[in-house]
């Protein structure tokens, strides 16, 4: 395929136009008075959102050189979202500012490779300053602040703080769509897995159609149980003890299942059977998790253990187990605290090592089930359009909260960037173009405050000067139109988000400045040839 090539100034100018188109669309959403963007969808209703990365992902420009510029800045938003889960609008805005200032200097004759060095030095210093003013997130109030700022909604802040308080920092919090109009929090304490009873006759509460076993023994095996002879010795022990039994096995079928059901209906003993969760190697790991949580042992083919030889010491114990048609929840397993902690550390190490997003997600779920529990935020709204928008804001707020717990929080509203300017501007270099790179970052650090002010209809330059001349940590509160201590007034941003946005923006922007040629495909005008009814297909002109 033939290519079109543009060089130096022409290439950079065209690509910058693409950068501006994308960034100008995204940056209208920044700050508490930022607006939304409507995205057309091929199916269903349009999507209304203020999430930078969602908007950026939708943008494809017709002009190929402009599109290249837009795609480069899209990467800034995507990478920031992957690392921190929020701050994508800020990252896009910073990238645009660095590219704009950088290109002015490159056009004036500065060397882009040396500018790049200066940008790196300045960004490292700015990140150091951002980390200095960071403080750890302590308790529910701080978490609620971070979430409320991210979602621009105090109710959402409280909801996420409640969820994190209940399941802990390691717990999993998922966001789902609710069938009702209200938004509520549903917490599953203990370990839950998605397998229900094998027979409806096993229920103990016919009204709720669930089985509740108090202080049961738990048999954990990866074998298939087909004949009752396999577990008869164990069942006899259960009858003697007068205890209830939960069987977690690959499957319980045929005669074995029938016998368990008949004895339950006769009232001889209560036993509920469920299939083991997961598949393949993941199933083995999950069974081992359950064993550690309940202080039991996995009766496995691989270890040569026979079900007939199982003693009471091999069985797990728990305060209670609840089983419905689809899920099993083990509450307060009697496992040794140290063993559980060791297992948690092992899973954390695996999360660090794995590169697959899917594996990481599954390991995170296992970690949550062992260490905290699972909370589900059910989002409700009057219309589907509002529901989607609200769900996105909650997901962003959740990511911001986790980032805050990880690396702490600092003053919000772009104040952390402005506070870093004095130290960054002190940096010097004997090489003039390196100093140019430092100056570019010094100027770009003002941009978030400028845009937040602009979106609120206020002159950004005036605000920036006042923030610069105020005490560190004092910034502009858009909602009250006052200059306040940001952290004391609950206007906070996670340090990880602030840092990642700047680092990713600088990385892509500095590379952009070094562009000297751009190559794109020339669309093939003869693409239509060979289609039915197309020119050259003799005798087919009249086809419908």
Swiss-Prot record:
SUPFAM superfamilies: GroEL apical domain-like, GroEL equatorial domain-like, GroEL-intermediate domain like. It is found in: Cytoplasm. The keyword Isomerase applies. One of its GO terms (biological process) is protein refolding. It holds the Pfam family Cpn60_TCP1. Its EC number is 5.6.1.7. One of its GO terms (cellular component) is cytoplasm. ATP binds at residues 29-32, 86-90, 413, 477-479, 493. Forms a cylinder of 14 subunits composed of two heptameric rings stacked back-to-back. Interacts with the co-chaperonin GroES. This is Chaperonin GroEL. The gene is groEL.
